[in-house]
């Protein structure tokens, strides 16, 4: 996507494979800064501290992190150590494990002397595949928005939660890709952007993206979505996913489940947009089996923003001494999901629906 007319991806390698550059998302929306990752530790810290975030981008960053590690130690033990370090950074997003498993499998088949170069080639392939998948998700999802616009005879009001745009992937995004494709095709679209506490990824990141692309949008408080649905102001909900089970349960940013409940109660379609790499084919019951990351209490107790004089400040917003819980994700049961928008098309959030799009998985099972 473009920032001030210049095309950017969220991650890109330096010539020669000595490092990769990422957009530092902890500085957005008030400062657009690039950060250089030159080692395994740099990549792991970037993932853990959410300099990069979003399931697909986490996976690609991990792939490049493993490639950086191969410059120092390309042995079997080196592969194992690097993969373990990266896997420990964020437990919920399945793309992380998927990318590491793919990288390790490719590297183990190659002679040790060839692994460093091969690792960067494979990481770049994963990045390119992510871009293609997200673009395809956008095409499939845009058809849904176009149909709603024709039926309604006016702008489509989309509600989204957290950030599942190009900042969460290499480019285009998942949940926002249909919005970008539809907008670029002339379909009138307006987006309600949940602020998405505690890290405000909707207000900070999704609004930043939509502003940059010229998409009409309104930032709302997290608890406003149900009210808007009750009063007919939302036509469709589209969210991303950090892990989707083989049965169609969708794990996404905390608060997604509540939006799905409100959408169901008001008969509003609720879609999750995700690439193949987000599907965990080993799990059937997402509520029971998906590990939910518990993050630092300071994300809840403190807020960081820009003051009127342009300085950045962090302030406390919770009564001192109050205990805090900070689960980062929740799981929306498949029964509340109208459909899954993938790079291969749209399907029901069921085992049969996913198997119809990915028949090779059924054969593998």
Swiss-Prot record:
The keyword Isomerase applies. Catalyzes the interconversion of methylthioribose-1-phosphate (MTR-1-P) into methylthioribulose-1-phosphate (MTRu-1-P). The keyword Repeat does not apply. Keywords: Amino-acid biosynthesis, Isomerase, Methionine biosynthesis. This is Methylthioribose-1-phosphate isomerase. Pathway: Amino-acid biosynthesis; L-methionine biosynthesis via salvage pathway; L-methionine from S-methyl-5-thio-alpha-D-ribose 1-phosphate: step 1/6. PANTHER family: METHYLTHIORIBOSE-1-PHOSPHATE ISOMERASE. The record marks 162 as: Transition state stabilizer. InterPro entries: IF-2B-related, IF-M1Pi, IF_2B-like_C, Initiation_fac_2B_a/b/d, M1Pi_N, NagB/RpiA_transferase-like. Its EC number is 5.3.1.23. Substrate binds at residues 53-55, 90, 201, 252-253. GO terms for molecular function: S-methyl-5-thioribose-1-phosphate isomerase activity. It catalyses: 5-(methylsulfanyl)-alpha-D-ribose 1-phosphate = 5-(methylsulfanyl)-D-ribulose 1-phosphate. It is an enzyme of class 5 (isomerase). Transmembrane segments: none annotated. Belongs to the eIF-2B alpha/beta/delta subunits family. MtnA subfamily. It comes from the Bacteria.
